[in-house]
């Protein structure tokens, strides 16, 4: 009986080697029987060894009386003690039963829960946990090998032949420093030539960028070992994704490994946020020049028609909303050979209109660029992979069953040893497969190419006014907790208080004292009383002025930026701003003026993290202030990469303002633990693990912890150690926190609910606390700010409302 052909997902089901088996003869020789009947047959035998777990590859079907039977699908049979469990190929449980069968043989037919199964072979536990039917590596499903060599229709001696020299490549591959691309498997020197990156581009590439260009070329051309004709370049911000992309595009436009072809593609489309359209155009002309390439920016439907009719242009740059509107109104008539999506985390949901509309393009070669490929969960990454290589990870449900759920279960505080090993195996399997088309490098490789960067986190002591208003809001929350949408409303108010109590001036509830509701509220003295952050900001701007250091101030709230704008005007600081309300036509000019102007012309740029946090080049600045942390750590990572990137020539300092003990700091702690899954999967860093939070975590958000230091430090050290460190007579206490703190004392004492909620599982080290997230940071308690070892160039030498700070240097 022949087995019906089914689609074999290259990751979940791999390749099944079929053997020519006469199933009709097997059914005649081996009568199908119930497992329970076998149990009766072998009952009473004392030498049966069933105390082990065994795994089998099977095919299954529902029990039917049809004459010509077909198998419905593949699956697994797990025998544990006397229990047999049947799973589908996507690990959906199909049924189970109790059995005393001593041995299961290949080709044997069994019946379990109304299903008839045929045993194919026994597999190892490693193969089962990895989620593959066989141990063979994945084969390229897109490039089948030629079965027969091409034969010309005429005999060689009857064809007119001329003796000619072998074809030559566009650039010499033997020159020192030449970057030569991979050759195809069917290489023939008579019909193929080497593809060599143009020297005027390759001479500017760093080593990691040369590797990236080679990787992207192999993926986009479907070279041996690559899956599909697409790729994801997921380098962290600042590593030069734009330059690598331009190099690959230019190479494909001007070269082909076929000697009789002048190019691999005829055109390419770059889809990016509207704030980056002009930046992409400038980058193309900056690296290639106006004489080599012609770029067209499409802002309406007529621009797309102009691009298709005018062969002068080979690159079209457009925004996500623009191209989606065009495709919805005019269909998918535009022919694009290469689709490039910048800031591709916009495609993190398969149900979004952007994903659905762009996926209608009949473009096989697709390149996604993103510095944050995994912001929240694995389903976002699955969505991006499914956009470039449909079906490579199976269906959404099968992906969740086979990978996402086991991986997340393995990071639960209650995970068993089996859950941990299964999750690790699935994670490794997923990483190995996706590494065929995903390239991810971390920003630390920039250290040898860029000047040093210093990160400073300031744990700021709130003013008395902030503490009073904060407590008043929390008291009101406890009495109105059942109101719909009240949680989000309170969180927004608490976040505003961390920045300044003035931001609540227009609230209906009377949170503020009467003296701060009159017309004098915006005087400098009253503004400083409303926020310790403004006090720190004033001191920093004064120190920046001495060294002529330009600064970028980043906030996610428009009201906060407007308040800072007013404060800068009072201090007579010249500034420019880029907010969500800034017209797109003016944004490029603002960035250009800020980068090229002198310190006296513009010393500060106010930047909205949501409007301008992606892709902007602000290397004219050397100081960046993150005024409040974002729930999404990717936003802050995007922001700091605006000034610390290729092209930066001077040392950089990143400041993060946190109101100690308030919502600010709790978000910051959540940030550093939230990146565990991204680090462990995308970066393949086994030391970083996902943190799981319980309901206790949510409760602690609506509280204020007044401490002498900060919550972050208390998570890393026990109270006895804190007292011994903070009560020393030294005016400054410095701690190099580069190793794990001992947990022996914590076992005998009760720890806080927040710390319990912050614990997670590490495969190698067991239960860990968030101190691992802050390894390598140096802690300081500035009772006297006249001495600041390591950060004296970045912190003003005057008394400031700072409980403590931690800093880290990247060089």
Curated annotation (Swiss-Prot):
- Record-level GO BP terms: double-strand break repair via homologous recombination; reciprocal meiotic recombination
Top-level lineage group: Eukaryota
Q: Which residues form the Helicase C-terminal domain?
A: 540-693
Record's subcellular location: Cytoplasm; Nucleus
Q: Where is this region: Disordered?
A: 20-42
- Predominant subcellular localization, coarse grouping: cytoplasm
The protein's GO terms of the molecular function aspect are: ATP binding; ATP hydrolysis activity; DNA binding; DNA translocase activity; helicase activity
Positions binding ATP in this chain are: 235-242
Fetch the InterPro entries from UniProt: Helicase_ATP-bd, Helicase_C-like, P-loop_NTPase, SNF2-like_sf, SNF2/RAD54-like_C, SNF2_N, SNF2_RAD54_helicase_repair
- One cellular component (GO) term of this entry: cytosol
What segments bear the compositional bias annotation Polar residues?
Answer: 20-33
Record keywords, A-Z: ATP-binding, Cytoplasm, DNA damage, DNA recombination, DNA repair, DNA-binding, Helicase, Hydrolase, Meiosis, Nucleotide-binding, Nucleus
Location of the Helicase ATP-binding domain: 222-391
Its function? Acts with rhp54 to repair meiotic double strand breaks via homologous recombination. Involved in meiotic DNA recombination.
Oligomer and partners: Interacts with dmc1 and rhp51.
Can you name this protein?
Meiotic recombination protein rdh54
- Please tell me the species this chain comes from: Schizosaccharomyces pombe (strain 972 / ATCC 24843)
Q: What is the lineage of its organism?
A: Eukaryota, Fungi, Dikarya, Ascomycota, Taphrinomycotina
